[in-house]
Amino acid sequence: MSALNLTVRVHPVVLFQVVDAFERRNADSHRVIGTLLGSVDKGVVEVTNCFCVPHKEHDDQVEAELSYALDMYDLNRKVNANESVVGWWATGNEVTNHSSVIHEYYARECNNPVHLTVDTSLQGGRMGLRAYVCIQLGVPGGKTGCMFTPIPVELTSYEPETFGLKLLQKTVGVSPAHRPKTVPPMLDLAQISEASTKLQSLLELILKYVDDVIAHKVTPDNAVGRQLLDLIHSVPHMTHEQFTQMFNANVRDLLMVITLSQLIKTQLQLNEKLTFLPTA
Protein backbone atom coordinates (compact mmCIF):
# COMPACT_ATOMS: atom_id res chain seq x y z
CA MET A 1 0.00 0.00 0.00
CA SER A 2 1.23 3.49 -0.85
CA ALA A 3 2.36 5.64 2.06
CA LEU A 4 0.05 8.43 0.86
CA ASN A 5 -2.97 6.19 1.53
CA LEU A 6 -2.16 5.84 5.23
CA THR A 7 -4.34 7.32 7.97
CA VAL A 8 -2.96 8.04 11.43
CA ARG A 9 -5.04 7.63 14.58
CA VAL A 10 -3.54 9.03 17.77
CA HIS A 11 -4.63 8.13 21.29
CA PRO A 12 -4.80 10.80 24.04
CA VAL A 13 -2.06 9.20 26.14
CA VAL A 14 0.41 9.93 23.32
CA LEU A 15 -0.35 13.66 23.44
CA PHE A 16 -0.04 13.68 27.23
CA GLN A 17 3.38 12.03 27.03
CA VAL A 18 4.54 14.50 24.38
CA VAL A 19 3.47 17.47 26.48
CA ASP A 20 5.10 15.96 29.59
CA ALA A 21 8.37 15.44 27.71
CA PHE A 22 8.23 19.02 26.41
CA GLU A 23 7.70 20.39 29.93
CA ARG A 24 10.66 18.35 31.26
CA ARG A 25 13.07 19.31 28.46
CA ASN A 26 16.43 20.90 29.13
CA ALA A 27 16.59 24.67 29.25
CA ASP A 28 18.67 24.84 26.06
CA SER A 29 16.40 22.49 24.07
CA HIS A 30 13.99 24.10 21.65
CA ARG A 31 12.56 20.86 20.29
CA VAL A 32 11.82 17.41 21.70
CA ILE A 33 11.64 14.24 19.63
CA GLY A 34 10.71 10.65 20.35
CA THR A 35 9.54 7.29 19.04
CA LEU A 36 5.94 6.43 18.17
CA LEU A 37 4.67 2.97 19.09
CA GLY A 38 1.55 1.24 17.88
CA SER A 39 0.32 -0.98 15.07
CA VAL A 40 -0.50 -0.83 11.36
CA ASP A 41 -3.55 -2.56 9.94
CA LYS A 42 -5.25 -2.07 6.56
CA GLY A 43 -3.76 1.35 5.92
CA VAL A 44 -4.45 2.68 9.43
CA VAL A 45 -1.53 3.56 11.70
CA GLU A 46 -2.81 3.47 15.27
CA VAL A 47 -0.43 5.23 17.66
CA THR A 48 -1.03 4.00 21.22
CA ASN A 49 2.22 4.87 23.00
CA CYS A 50 5.45 6.84 22.67
CA PHE A 51 8.60 7.81 24.52
CA CYS A 52 11.12 10.63 24.35
CA VAL A 53 14.60 10.24 22.83
CA PRO A 54 17.27 12.66 24.13
CA HIS A 55 19.01 14.51 21.33
CA LYS A 56 20.91 17.67 20.43
CA GLU A 57 20.55 19.63 17.22
CA HIS A 58 23.38 21.68 15.76
CA ASP A 59 23.51 23.71 12.59
CA ASP A 60 25.02 20.90 10.53
CA GLN A 61 24.23 17.70 12.43
CA VAL A 62 21.94 15.89 14.86
CA GLU A 63 23.11 13.87 17.86
CA ALA A 64 20.56 11.38 19.20
CA GLU A 65 21.01 8.75 21.91
CA LEU A 66 20.03 5.77 19.77
CA SER A 67 21.12 3.24 22.40
CA TYR A 68 18.64 4.83 24.81
CA ALA A 69 15.89 4.51 22.19
CA LEU A 70 16.68 0.82 21.66
CA ASP A 71 16.68 0.12 25.41
CA MET A 72 13.35 1.89 25.87
CA TYR A 73 11.84 -0.05 22.99
CA ASP A 74 13.06 -3.38 24.39
CA LEU A 75 11.62 -2.54 27.82
CA ASN A 76 8.29 -1.60 26.27
CA ARG A 77 8.18 -4.85 24.29
CA LYS A 78 8.40 -6.78 27.54
CA VAL A 79 5.27 -5.02 28.78
CA ASN A 80 3.31 -4.88 25.52
CA ALA A 81 4.56 -7.11 22.74
CA ASN A 82 1.83 -5.88 20.37
CA GLU A 83 3.35 -2.40 20.07
CA SER A 84 6.05 -1.82 17.49
CA VAL A 85 7.81 1.22 16.06
CA VAL A 86 5.55 3.06 13.59
CA GLY A 87 7.41 6.38 13.32
CA TRP A 88 8.57 9.34 15.35
CA TRP A 89 7.24 12.59 16.78
CA ALA A 90 8.58 16.08 17.34
CA THR A 91 7.31 19.22 19.01
CA GLY A 92 6.72 22.25 16.84
CA ASN A 93 4.46 23.17 13.96
CA GLU A 94 6.81 22.58 11.03
CA VAL A 95 9.26 20.14 9.50
CA THR A 96 12.87 21.29 9.97
CA ASN A 97 16.03 20.65 7.96
CA HIS A 98 17.09 17.94 10.43
CA SER A 99 13.82 16.03 10.09
CA SER A 100 14.98 14.12 7.01
CA VAL A 101 18.07 12.86 8.88
CA ILE A 102 15.99 11.63 11.81
CA HIS A 103 13.40 10.12 9.47
CA GLU A 104 16.12 8.18 7.68
CA TYR A 105 16.95 6.37 10.93
CA TYR A 106 13.32 5.41 11.57
CA ALA A 107 13.00 4.22 7.96
CA ARG A 108 15.46 1.48 8.93
CA GLU A 109 13.33 0.53 11.95
CA CYS A 110 9.96 0.14 10.16
CA ASN A 111 8.29 0.40 6.77
CA ASN A 112 6.75 3.76 5.85
CA PRO A 113 7.36 5.50 9.19
CA VAL A 114 5.05 8.39 9.97
CA HIS A 115 6.21 11.71 11.35
CA LEU A 116 3.93 13.42 13.86
CA THR A 117 4.34 17.09 14.79
CA VAL A 118 2.68 18.45 17.92
CA ASP A 119 2.50 22.23 18.33
CA THR A 120 2.98 22.67 22.08
CA SER A 121 2.92 26.48 21.77
CA LEU A 122 -0.90 26.25 21.68
CA GLN A 123 -1.23 28.92 19.00
CA GLY A 124 -4.86 29.91 18.69
CA GLY A 125 -5.71 28.06 21.88
CA ARG A 126 -5.39 24.64 20.22
CA MET A 127 -2.71 21.98 20.03
CA GLY A 128 -1.80 21.63 16.37
CA LEU A 129 -1.44 18.01 15.28
CA ARG A 130 -0.10 16.99 11.87
CA ALA A 131 1.14 13.75 10.34
CA TYR A 132 3.56 13.28 7.44
CA VAL A 133 5.13 10.56 5.37
CA CYS A 134 8.37 10.93 3.45
CA ILE A 135 8.13 10.44 -0.32
CA GLN A 136 11.29 9.76 -2.31
CA LEU A 137 11.84 12.08 -5.29
CA GLY A 138 14.34 11.97 -8.14
CA VAL A 139 15.19 10.35 -11.46
CA PRO A 140 16.94 7.01 -12.03
CA GLY A 141 20.68 7.48 -12.03
CA GLY A 142 20.41 11.09 -10.85
CA LYS A 143 20.09 12.95 -7.61
CA THR A 144 17.38 11.83 -5.22
CA GLY A 145 15.68 13.53 -2.32
CA CYS A 146 12.63 13.27 -0.13
CA MET A 147 9.59 15.38 0.59
CA PHE A 148 7.36 15.28 3.67
CA THR A 149 3.76 14.99 2.52
CA PRO A 150 0.80 15.49 4.91
CA ILE A 151 -1.57 12.57 5.50
CA PRO A 152 -4.88 12.45 7.42
CA VAL A 153 -4.63 12.34 11.20
CA GLU A 154 -7.40 11.98 13.75
CA LEU A 155 -7.83 11.42 17.47
CA THR A 156 -9.26 8.18 18.80
CA SER A 157 -9.60 6.61 22.22
CA TYR A 158 -10.56 3.44 24.01
CA GLU A 159 -13.49 3.50 26.41
CA PRO A 160 -11.30 3.83 29.57
CA GLU A 161 -9.43 6.73 27.94
CA THR A 162 -12.73 8.45 27.13
CA PHE A 163 -13.82 8.07 30.75
CA GLY A 164 -10.53 9.56 31.96
CA LEU A 165 -10.87 12.52 29.59
CA LYS A 166 -14.34 13.22 30.94
CA LEU A 167 -12.91 13.33 34.47
CA LEU A 168 -10.19 15.72 33.33
CA GLN A 169 -12.78 18.03 31.78
CA LYS A 170 -14.24 18.60 35.24
CA THR A 171 -11.15 20.67 36.12
CA VAL A 172 -11.25 22.78 32.94
CA GLY A 173 -12.13 26.38 33.71
CA VAL A 174 -11.27 26.05 37.40
CA SER A 175 -8.65 28.48 38.68
CA PRO A 176 -5.33 26.87 39.70
CA ALA A 177 -5.85 27.98 43.31
CA HIS A 178 -9.13 26.06 43.59
CA ARG A 179 -8.30 23.22 41.22
CA PRO A 180 -8.36 19.84 42.99
CA LYS A 181 -5.21 17.75 42.83
CA THR A 182 -7.23 14.57 42.42
CA VAL A 183 -10.57 13.84 40.77
CA PRO A 184 -12.08 10.71 42.32
CA PRO A 185 -14.34 8.54 40.15
CA MET A 186 -18.05 9.01 40.69
CA LEU A 187 -20.22 6.42 42.36
CA ASP A 188 -22.19 4.11 40.12
CA LEU A 189 -25.54 5.77 40.81
CA ALA A 190 -24.05 9.21 40.19
CA GLN A 191 -22.68 7.98 36.85
CA ILE A 192 -26.13 6.69 35.88
CA SER A 193 -27.70 10.02 36.83
CA GLU A 194 -25.14 12.01 34.82
CA ALA A 195 -25.45 9.68 31.81
CA SER A 196 -29.24 9.93 31.92
CA THR A 197 -29.08 13.73 32.03
CA LYS A 198 -26.68 13.82 29.09
CA LEU A 199 -28.85 11.35 27.15
CA GLN A 200 -31.90 13.52 27.74
CA SER A 201 -30.11 16.63 26.45
CA LEU A 202 -28.96 14.75 23.34
CA LEU A 203 -32.49 13.50 22.68
CA GLU A 204 -33.79 17.06 22.96
CA LEU A 205 -31.14 18.16 20.45
CA ILE A 206 -32.21 15.41 18.02
CA LEU A 207 -35.89 16.30 18.40
CA LYS A 208 -35.12 19.95 17.71
CA TYR A 209 -33.19 19.00 14.56
CA VAL A 210 -36.06 16.81 13.31
CA ASP A 211 -38.63 19.55 14.01
CA ASP A 212 -36.48 22.12 12.17
CA VAL A 213 -36.17 19.80 9.16
CA ILE A 214 -39.94 19.22 9.08
CA ALA A 215 -40.52 22.99 9.32
CA HIS A 216 -37.98 23.56 6.49
CA LYS A 217 -35.79 25.65 8.78
CA VAL A 218 -32.76 23.41 8.27
CA THR A 219 -31.56 21.69 5.13
CA PRO A 220 -31.89 17.90 5.65
CA ASP A 221 -28.73 15.83 5.71
CA ASN A 222 -29.06 12.33 4.25
CA ALA A 223 -26.17 10.98 6.34
CA VAL A 224 -27.80 12.21 9.56
CA GLY A 225 -31.12 10.75 8.44
CA ARG A 226 -29.58 7.32 7.87
CA GLN A 227 -27.91 7.42 11.28
CA LEU A 228 -31.21 8.34 12.96
CA LEU A 229 -32.94 5.49 11.12
CA ASP A 230 -30.27 3.02 12.27
CA LEU A 231 -30.66 4.37 15.80
CA ILE A 232 -34.42 3.79 15.74
CA HIS A 233 -34.01 0.25 14.41
CA SER A 234 -31.48 -0.55 17.14
CA VAL A 235 -34.02 0.17 19.90
CA PRO A 236 -35.51 -3.15 21.13
CA HIS A 237 -39.27 -3.46 20.69
CA MET A 238 -40.90 -4.01 24.08
CA THR A 239 -43.86 -2.81 26.06
CA HIS A 240 -43.67 -0.27 28.85
CA GLU A 241 -44.21 -3.01 31.44
CA GLN A 242 -41.38 -5.12 30.01
CA PHE A 243 -39.01 -2.16 30.01
CA THR A 244 -39.94 -1.25 33.60
CA GLN A 245 -39.39 -4.82 34.76
CA MET A 246 -36.01 -5.05 33.02
CA PHE A 247 -34.91 -1.65 34.35
CA ASN A 248 -35.89 -2.50 37.93
CA ALA A 249 -34.04 -5.82 37.71
CA ASN A 250 -30.87 -4.06 36.56
CA VAL A 251 -31.20 -1.49 39.35
CA ARG A 252 -31.54 -4.26 41.93
CA ASP A 253 -28.44 -5.96 40.55
CA LEU A 254 -26.54 -2.67 40.69
CA LEU A 255 -27.59 -2.02 44.29
CA MET A 256 -26.53 -5.55 45.24
CA VAL A 257 -23.09 -5.01 43.68
CA ILE A 258 -22.70 -1.69 45.52
CA THR A 259 -23.69 -3.29 48.83
CA LEU A 260 -21.27 -6.18 48.40
CA SER A 261 -18.43 -3.85 47.42
CA GLN A 262 -19.03 -1.69 50.49
CA LEU A 263 -19.02 -4.80 52.70
CA ILE A 264 -15.73 -5.95 51.19
CA LYS A 265 -14.24 -2.48 51.68
CA THR A 266 -15.34 -2.45 55.33
CA GLN A 267 -13.91 -5.92 55.89
CA LEU A 268 -10.57 -4.92 54.39
CA GLN A 269 -10.40 -1.80 56.56
CA LEU A 270 -11.23 -3.86 59.66
CA ASN A 271 -8.61 -6.45 58.75
CA GLU A 272 -6.01 -3.68 58.31
CA LYS A 273 -6.76 -2.25 61.74
CA LEU A 274 -6.60 -5.70 63.36
CA THR A 275 -3.24 -6.34 61.72
CA PHE A 276 -1.67 -3.29 63.40
CA LEU A 277 -3.09 -4.07 66.86
CA PRO A 278 -0.30 -4.71 69.39
CA THR A 279 0.01 -8.35 70.38
CA ALA A 280 0.01 -9.32 74.04
UniProtKB/Swiss-Prot annotation:
Coiled coil residues, start to end: none
Sequence ranges assigned to domain MPN in this UniProt record: 8-138
CDD domains assigned: MPN_eIF3f
Give the main location.
cytoplasm
> SMART domains, from UniProt?
JAB_MPN
- Gene Ontology biological process terms, A to Z: antibacterial innate immune response; defense response to Gram-negative bacterium; formation of cytoplasmic translation initiation complex; positive regulation of Notch signaling pathway; positive regulation of peptidoglycan recognition protein signaling pathway
Keyword entries, A-Z: Cytoplasm, Initiation factor, Protein biosynthesis
Task: Provide a Gene Ontology MF annotation, just one.
Answer: translation initiation factor activity
Membrane-spanning segments: none
Where does the record say this protein resides? Cytoplasm
One Gene Ontology cellular component annotation?
A: eukaryotic 43S preinitiation complex
Task: Name the Gene3D superfamilies for this protein.
Answer: Cytidine Deaminase, domain 2
Q: What does this protein do?
A: Component of the eukaryotic translation initiation factor 3 (eIF-3) complex, which is involved in protein synthesis of a specialized repertoire of mRNAs and, together with other initiation factors, stimulates binding of mRNA and methionyl-tRNAi to the 40S ribosome. The eIF-3 complex specifically targets and initiates translation of a subset of mRNAs involved in cell proliferation.
Subunit info here reads: Component of the eukaryotic translation initiation factor 3 (eIF-3) complex. The eIF-3 complex interacts with pix.
Similarity comment = Belongs to the eIF-3 subunit F family.
According to UniProt, the name of this protein is Eukaryotic translation initiation factor 3 subunit F-1
Organism equals Drosophila virilis
